[in-house]
Swiss-Prot record:
Cellular component terms (Gene Ontology): T=2 icosahedral viral capsid; viral inner capsid; viral nucleocapsid
Written domain comment of the UniProt record: The N-terminus binds RNA. It is necessary for encapsidation of VP1 and VP3. The N-termini of 10 VP2 molecules form a cylindrical hub underneath each 5-fold axis of the inner capsid.
Organism: Rotavirus A (strain RVA/Human/Indonesia/69M/1980/G8P4[10]) (RV-A)
Region feature 5-fold hub, mapped onto this chain: 1-80
Name the UniProt record assigns to this protein: Inner capsid protein VP2
Length: 880
């Protein structure tokens, strides 16, 4: 971890820990210019363990006299035996959804509010297209007719596939649906205008060009196009633009314009956007220097709470979210400053312990792993774990009494729920059997695995000493208080911890323990415990300050959290070495550190953006699931929808999420109501599916099968063809149902009775206008007579197939030859383009400016950290 250290002396005789610190100090200047997030995650985290002490002692062995070597080797031996003697297994489950990488912080910070892309075109499904008209004898006329056709014709065949196409179209509309529209940004010049007027977008302009140049266009329409221009109402900040749109496209764009998400922005909104506890915190000085224009707008973030309850029964997903929150929180916890010099503190501790020759085995361990990096790391871990509600596990060695005494401070200030139970029980049992029970001469506690009571709860009932029992009672009842602040569930620390008074309670208990006789233990044992307690009690003032500092930083950063802080144990844990807790207790200085305003705003913005994106993606997923059900997509893989939802949240490794959680998530999403805008858009698509199908060149809507030949009919769009334009008089059977049941008896019976039958459903419909290429592909003898007697250029062949098992049929219509067929394709007529009914006026604001980062208007500073006060209006750190 990056940290600052003053007054550190480097001795020539550097051990392994010092070398690690030197590397950090060398990198310090380089890291100063790096952003806070980069600085925190600039290198792999180092955890200080007791193994480092073994290396340290081994180094000292080489440089000491033979006599000291023997004594220190004895220490090593004893340590190893103790490590092997007590090993408590920490519950560790593998988590499949997330690998903690530094990239997760970048992913979180890259989630920005959806900037409405600068819209250059309106949303369109249709475009007008010119098609030739055929005479009664099959010849093309010189005239053309305009029809509305699909811009992007990707309609598949098969009823189910077509419904899936509409679901994908809906998904596309949801993706493209703008938060706001400014028509002025997309308007282009109308080339045919008399007075340099503008139309709404380039496609409208190109349609106007094509119609203007069409010889058959009426003069009145040309005159109208020449008059087409924008109409500005400057006093109302409104502008109207002419547009040419299919009625369905007009309905979409008009809906987008009427339901924009932008809202007026003023100073009050920005002021209220800042978390209330930051506004009211006297340590932060906030100013707004700028008056916003009347055209200022913003998009309110979507911060609905707890619609999926991922903490409830979604272990893998919850673990991923808490892990990413933990990494983010660590990046914003301030670094400790002006820690006590490690070397000076170790020397002072050695003097207090009277360890001239380091002869007492147990007390040599008191100095293990103490360094400023471990202290800083511990400070960050504790605050970040509480902010993200990550469960912690404790690593310690039972023979290191100093670690256990530091652990007593840790268990006093951090609620029990923050530790995984197995780890908590192991630590409490070690404290009880090493310190508490021996002090009173009580028998060693034999704890049964699975006991509903913790060792401290049992010890509280059995301890006669009031002060010790009182402290045990506090620890046993140290839980977060759940408080709803600004609509967000917060986990708040006990007031006695926030003001540091609980440390006096801890010290009273420790003093009582140090005064006991330890009747069943040797004198050296008693003396070791007493000296360990003395080391901690000498720093009473600093420990009170440290507790207040920890609580203040936690609560200040907690004000920037926007999602409910649900407390559920996580699958994986954050490891905490008790030696690093000792480092924190022994090295904490008197310099106050509080988060900078820029850090707070950054943390708040990242939380808001993630939360808003989370809710928007939920809305999308709920809408798609509802649409799939309404479209009767019985085979639609809901898992794919849920996977897509998780991918859009950016922090999940979706391939590793267990299937059971996917399906549980699907069930939760199904229970949620659809957001109004998304529901209205779906209803627009649902009502106009028929019109969209008609406009496709790729599919027909059915086929008529007969036992006897049916004469082909003349069609204006295709000549003489086997195309039917209505199904009047035919009995209709649904093709999808027919294929699903596989019962063709009904069709057979009808055909045998000489009754044509209409099979209704989406079928391939392909036209090919190149007759030469068609004949080249087929046996020329089929068309011999036709080619001989007629002009090839006037032929209009049509290829269609009923299903994959049937043959392809080519039918040719020309002149007076009237062929017959036993099948007809049912193809609905696309909508004709009519200029008057397609001309619409669209209205939007003439201009406005959308601001995404509201906090950019706020200039913020802090008081001098030394003067910073906590919630009780007293300085955070009083020990000067």
């Amino acid at each position: 971890m990056a940290y600052r250290k003053r007054g550190a002396r480097r001795e020539a005789n550097v051990n392994n820990n010092n070398r690690m610190q030197e590397k950090d100090n060398e990198k310090q200047d380089q890291n100063n210019k790096i952003q806070l997030s980069d600085k925190v995650l600039s290198k792999k985290e180092e955890v200080i363990t007791d193994n480092q002490e073994e290396i340290k002692i081994a180094d000292e062995v080489k440089k000491s006299t033979k006599e000291e070597s023997k004594q220190l080797l004895e220490v090593l031996k004893t340590k190893e035996e103790h490590q092997k003697e007590i090993q408590y297994e920490i519950l560790q489950k593998t988590i499949p959804t997330f690998e903690p990488k530094e990239s997760i912080l970048k992913k979180l910070e890259d989630i920005k509010p959806e900037q409405a892309k600068k819209q250059t075109k309106l949303f369109r499904i249709f475009e007008p297209r010119q098609l030739p008209i055929y005479r009664a004898n099959g010849e093309k006329e010189l005239r053309n007719r305009w029809y509305w056709k699909l811009k992007k014709d990707t309609l598949p065949d098969g009823d189910y596939d077509v419904r899936e196409y509409f679901l994908n179209l809906y998904d596309q509309v949801l993706t493209e649906m703008p938060d706001y529209l400014l028509l002025k940004d997309m308007a282009v010049e109308n080339k045919n205008s008399r007075d340099a007027g503008k139309v709404v977008d380039s496609e409208t302009a190109s349609i106007c060009d094509a119609i203007f140049q069409d010889e058959e266009t009426e003069g009145a329409v040309r005159r109208f196009i020449a008059e087409m221009r924008q109409r500005v109402q400057a006093d109302r900040n409104v502008v109207n633009y002419p547009s040419i749109l299919h009625p369905i496209d007009y309905a979409f764009n008009e809906y987008f314009l009427q339901h924009q998400l932008v809202e007026p922005l003023n100073n009050d909104i920005i002021f209220n956007y800042i978390p209330e506890r930051i506004r009211n915190d006297v340590n932060y000085i906030l100013n707004m220097d700028r008056n916003l224009p009347s055209t200022a707008r913003y998009i309110r973030p979507n911060l609905l709470q707890d619609r999926l309850n991922l903490h409830d029964n979604f272990e893998s997903l919850w673990d991923t979210i808490t892990t990413s929150n933990y990494i983010l929180a660590r990046s914003v916890v301030p670094d400790l400053k002006e820690l006590v010099s490690t070397e000076a503190q170790i020397q002072k501790m050695s003097q207090d312990l009277q360890l001239e020759a380091l002869t007492i085995q147990s007390e040599t361990q008191f100095l293990t792993g103490i360094n400023s990096q471990a202290a800083n790391d511990c400070f960050k871990t504790l605050i970040a774990a509480m902010l993200s509600q990550r469960t912690m596990s404790l690593d310690f060695v039972t023979t290191n009494y100093m670690s256990l005494i530091s652990g007593m401070w840790l268990l006093t200030v951090v609620p029990n729920d923050m530790f995984i139970r197995e780890s908590l029980v192991a630590c409490q049992l070690a404290i009880v059997n090493t310190i508490v029970y021996p002090a009173f001469g009580m028998q060693r506690m034999h704890y049964r695995n699975g006991d509903p009571q913790t060792p401290f709860q049992i010890a509280e009932q059995q301890t006669q000493n009031f002060q010790v029992a009182n402290w045990l009672h506090f620890v046993n009842n140290n839980q977060f208080r759940q408080v709803v602040i600004d609509g967000v569930l917060n986990q708040v620390l006990n007031d006695n911890i926030r003001n540091g008074h609980v440390i006096n309670q801890l010290m009273e208990a420790l003093m009582q323990l140090s005064r006991q006789q330890f009747p069943t233990m040797p004198v050296d044992y008693k003396r070791s415990i007493q000296r360990g307690i003395l080391l901690l009690s000498n720093r009473l003032g600093q420990l009170v300050d440290l507790t207040r500092l920890l609580a203040y930083n936690y609560e200040t950063l907690m004000a920037c959290i926007t999602m409910n802080m649900q407390h559920v144990q996580t699958l994986t844990t954050e490891k905490l070495q008790l030696t690093s807790v000792t480092s924190l207790c022994m090295l904490i200085g008197n310099a106050t550190v509080i988060p900078s305003p820029q850090t707070l705003f950054h943390y708040y913005n990242v939380n808001v953006n993630f939360h808003s994106n989370y809710n928007e993606r939920i809305n999308d997923a709920v809408a798609i699931i509802t649409a799939a059900n309404r479209l009767n997509l019985y085979q639609k893989k809901m898992k794919a929808i849920v996977e897509d939802f998780l991918k859009r949240l950016h922090i999940f490794d979706v391939a590793r999420v267990p299937d059971d959680q996917m399906y549980r998530l699907r069930d939760r999403l199904r229970l949620l109501p659809v957001e109004v805008r998304r529901l209205d858009i779906f209803n627009l698509i649902l009502m106009n599916m028929d019109q969209i199908e008609r406009a496709s060149d790729k599919i027909a809507q059915g086929v008529i099968i007969a036992y006897r030949d049916m004469q082909l009919e003349r069609d204006e769009m295709y000549g003489y063809v086997n195309i039917a334009r209505n199904l009047d008089g035919f009995q209709q059977i649904n093709l999808e149902e027919l294929m699903r049941t596989g019962d063709y008896a009904q069709i057979t019976n009808m055909l045998l009775n000489n009754q044509p039958v209409a099979l209704v459903g989406a079928l391939p419909f392909i036209t090919d206008s190149s007759v030469i290429s068609l004949i080249a592909k087929l046996d020329a003898t089929v068309f011999a007579q036709i080619v001989k007697l007629r002009k090839v250029d006037t032929l209009k062949p049509i290829l269609y197939k009923i299903n994959s098992d049937s043959n392809d049929f080519y039918l040719v219509a020309n002149y007076d030859w009237v062929p017959t067929s036993t099948t007809k394709v049912y193809k609905q007529v696309p909508q004709q383009f009519d200029f008057r009914s397609s001309m619409h006026m669209l209205t939007s604001n003439l201009t406005f400016t959308v601001y995404s980062d509201l906090l950019a208007f706020v200039s913020a500073d802090t008081v001098e950290p030394i003067n910073a006060v906590a919630f009780d209006n007293m300085r955070i750190m009083n020990e000067l």
